[in-house]
C-alpha cells in the first residue's frame, strides 16, 4: 500500500458511520495484526537495533543482509506477483508492467554506462522510500478503521492524512539539512537554523492533528476498536518523528538516512507481506482455488525476490566487468522505484475488488472465473501445474536461485570482515570486479605490510569503476603513500581532466607538482582550488606558504586569514592540527607588523603564543614569543621585548631542537648588544649558542661562531673568566631588567 489514497466520493460524508458490531476488524489474529501489521514491535526492535548495531556491527549487518532474503526481496516480488501472474492484472496495469518497466531498464543500462546518474537515482530511491512507508501505514490505518465500522469523517481523515504528510516532510527536511556525508545521496544543503524550527513545528502539528483525530474517533467508539489505528499512528511516530524528537530535546544529531533504512525496511517489508498474503489468499479462494498455500506462496516470493536482486548485478559484473558495488546499488534503486510506482497503482481502497477483499471478507471477487483463455494463460497454467516437466523446471529454477543466494551471502560475509585478509581474498576471488571488496582488501594488505599487493588492489578498484571520483582519489593517495610521486602526479592529472572542479583533487595535484619542482603549476592549481571552493583550507594554506616563499607577504597573509577563518568556522565539527594554525597566526601577525598595523600585530603574536601554550605546542610558542620580541623592539618596547625573549629561552630549555634554541640565544645576544648591555652577557649567550650547535654543523654554526669571535675580541681578557663559568652568566641573562636607553 504505497499511496495515501483518497476515499471514494460516496464515502466522503460529514457525519460518521455508526460502528458495526458484526464486522471483524482483524486480518489474522489480534496479536499478529498488531505486532506485524500495525508495527507494535517497532519500539523493541529499534532499541535492539541500536544496541546490536553498536556492539555487534558485523553480525548485525550480516543479519540484515540475510533478512533481506526472507522479507525485503519477497515483498518486492509480492507486487510483481500481483501484477504479472495473471493476464488480467498484467493488461490492467500495462503502462506500469511494460512501459514503465522498460523505461527503468533503459535507466539501468544508462546508469551502468554513466556512473554520474547513480547518485540521482539512488537519492530518488532514498527520498521516495519514506513516502512509500507513509502511504502503507496510512492505507492500513484507513482499512482497519473501516473494517471496524468506524469510518473517519472527512475532517478526521484529513487531519490524519495531513499529520502523516507532515511527518514525511519533517523527515525530508532532516535528510536535506547540511551537506550529505554519502557521495551517493544528494542533499539540498538546507541550513539547520531554518530546518530545525520547521521540523519542530511539523512535529507539533503531527501530534496535534493526529491527537485530535484519534480523540474524536475514540469518543464515538472505544479504545479496543481503534487500537489498530492508535498503534499505526504510534508506529508512524517511531519511524519518522522519534529521531527528530531526540535531536530537538537533546541536541544529539541522528543520521536519518541510516535510521530510515535497514531495520525500518525490514519492518515495512514484513508488514507488506502480512497484508499481501491475506489478499492473495482471499483472492485465490474467491477465484475457487482451494489449494492456495502460504508456504508455497512464500517460497515463490523468496525465489522471485532473489531473481529480482541477485543475478543481475553478478551477471553484469562478471560478464561486462562492471563494478559489482555500483551495479548492486543500481539494481536496488531501480527495483525499488518500480515497486513504488506499481504499488501506488494497485493498492487503492476505492478499487471495488480490493475493497471487497480487504474491507469485507465475505464478498466475492468479480475476477473469479474471468481468466482469459489465451496462450499466456495456458503457459502460466502449465508452468504452475502438476506436470512432471513443469514441476521439475520449477524445482530446478528455485534450487539455482537459492544456491546463487547462498553464494551471494557467503560473498557478503567474507567481504564484511575488514581485517581478515584470507576472507577478503576469497571474496575477491568470487568477484574480482567488486570495488568495495578491493578497497577493503587493500587496507587489510596495507596493515599486513603487503604494500605492493595493497597498491595493486587499489588499482583494481579504481580500474573497475573509472567514473568513481572517490576511488580514483584513493588510488592517487595510495600512490603518494607508496612514494610513487610521478605515477601519482599522472593519476591526479587524469582526475583533473575528468573532474576539473574538484577542489580536493586540485589541492593534491598542486602538492605533487610542488614536490616535483613544478611550483608555478602548483600555485596555479591551488588558485583554481580556492576559486572552486574558498573554504578549502588546505588550498588556502599551501597557497599562502607558496606566496610567502616568493616574498609576497601581504598576498600570503590574505590566504592565511581565509585559512584561519575557515578553520575557526568548523573547529567544533572538524578540529584541525594546531601546528599549521599557529604558524598561520604568526605569519598574519608578521604581515600586520610589516605594514605598521601595530595593534593587530601585537594581538596576533600574543594570541599565537597563548594558543600554543594551551595546546602544548612549546616550539611554536617559543617562535611566537621571539617574533613578538622582535616586533616589540622595533616599537621601542624594550622591556617587553626582553621579557618575551626570556620567556622563549626558558621554553627552549625543555625542547630538543638545537637549531631553534641556538638561533634564539643568538638573537637574544644581538638584542642585548643593541641595548648596550654588558658585553659579558652578550659573549656568554653567544658562547652558549655555539656550544648547543657543536654537534650540528652548518651555516648556523658558522654565523654563531663568527659572532662569538667578534664579541670575544670586544671583551678582551675578561673573556677568559667568562669561559670558566658561562652557565652562571647565561642564567643571569634570563633575569636582566633591560630598559630603553
Pin down the residues of each PLM region:
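Canonical positions in the second alpha-helix
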Residues: 427, 460-461, 494-495, 528-529, ...
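Register position in tetratricopeptide repeats
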Residues: 447, 481-482, 515-516, 549, ...
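Single-residue signature of alpha-solenoid repeat helices
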Residues: 420, 454, 488, 522, ...
